[in-house]
């Protein structure tokens, strides 16, 4: 079987792990070939040209060859982009990479998904407020994977209307809700306003409530696809719990009985 060669393909590194003594096994997402497994020989050696190039969150130009599932990476170049994310943005970048790693299959070309990945990575690395970008990416990912419901019409054939309430369930059409939404809040699925569905569909969140309901929707579908959960989200939640405990410890009562931050 002849070797298939790919040259100068833009990719994002999703994950890497040591391979034997000095090499790396890399999972990358490419624009034309989807997710690919690459063997970067000697990449862990101090003198390797690949050592400082194979980093996540930024686009890289990669060249590889091979007819097996694990290809051989023979060249990689940084093609410019943006700085590495810092603080909590780092966990957001790891979260996006984990979604890509767990929800995509190897060598399934999805150019639109590559473009969506590039957009959200730039936002996470460069913007102070990027949460709306995360919600847009999650919904585009679910759409491109074919698991998101149609947000133009409900299960009865009617248009999604801003002033109506709807129920969303994985693997089902969006259905209008006639009962009191508060009374249904304990039921399975997500109960959301029509305006929030329109905002999610258009990728433009008009209010904080709309953005919060978008999180409810995307989390519902992601949990359905990944019931075992996501490591990056679990770590971030642990950090948030620690921050809340530290804030509580730093808050002390004043002489008049009110609370005051001690720091």
Swiss-Prot record:
Record protein name field: DNA repair protein RecO
Gene Ontology cellular-component annotations: bacterial nucleoid
InterPro entries cross-referenced by the UniProt entry: ARFGAP/RecO, DNA_rep/recomb_RecO_N, NA-bd_OB-fold, RecO, RecO_C
Residue stretches of biased makeup (Polar residues): 252-263
Region (Disordered), start-end ranges: 243-263
Biological function: Involved in DNA repair and RecF pathway recombination.
Gene transcribed to yield this protein: recO
Keywords: DNA damage, DNA recombination, DNA repair
Single GO biological process annotation from the record: DNA recombination
Pfam families given in the database record: RecO_C, RecO_N
Keyword Cell inner membrane: no
UniProt record similarity statement: Belongs to the RecO family.
């Amino acid at each position: 079987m002849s070797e298939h060669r790919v040259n100068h393909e833009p990719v994002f590194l999703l994950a890497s792990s040591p391979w034997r003594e000095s090499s790396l096994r890399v999972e990358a997402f490419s624009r034309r070939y989807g997710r690919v497994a690459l063997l970067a020989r000697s990449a862990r050696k101090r003198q390797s040209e690949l050592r400082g190039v194979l980093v996540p969150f930024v686009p890289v130009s990669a060249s590889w060859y091979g007819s097996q599932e694990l290809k051989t990476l023979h060249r990689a170049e940084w093609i410019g982009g943006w700085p590495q994310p810092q603080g909590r943005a780092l966990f957001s970048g790891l979260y996006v990479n984990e979604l890509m790693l767990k929800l995509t299959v190897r060598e399934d070309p999805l150019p639109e998904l590559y473009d969506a990945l590039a957009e959200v990575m730039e936002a996470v690395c460069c913007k102070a407020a990027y949460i709306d970008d995360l919600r847009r990416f999650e919904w585009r990912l679910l759409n491109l994977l074919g698991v998101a419901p149609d947000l133009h019409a409900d299960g009865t054939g009617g248009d999604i209307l801003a002033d109506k309430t709807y129920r969303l369930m994985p693997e089902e059409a969006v259905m209008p809700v006639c009962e009191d939404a508060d009374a249904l809040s304990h039921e399975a699925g997500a109960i959301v306003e029509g305006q929030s569905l329109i905002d999610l569909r258009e990728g433009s969140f008009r209010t904080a409530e709309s953005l919060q309901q978008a999180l409810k929707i995307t989390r519902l579908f992601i949990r359905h696809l990944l019931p075992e959960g996501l490591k990056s989200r679990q770590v971030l939640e642990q950090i948030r719990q620690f921050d809340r405990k530290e804030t509580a410890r730093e808050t002390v009562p004043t002489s008049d009985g009110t609370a005051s931050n001690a720091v």
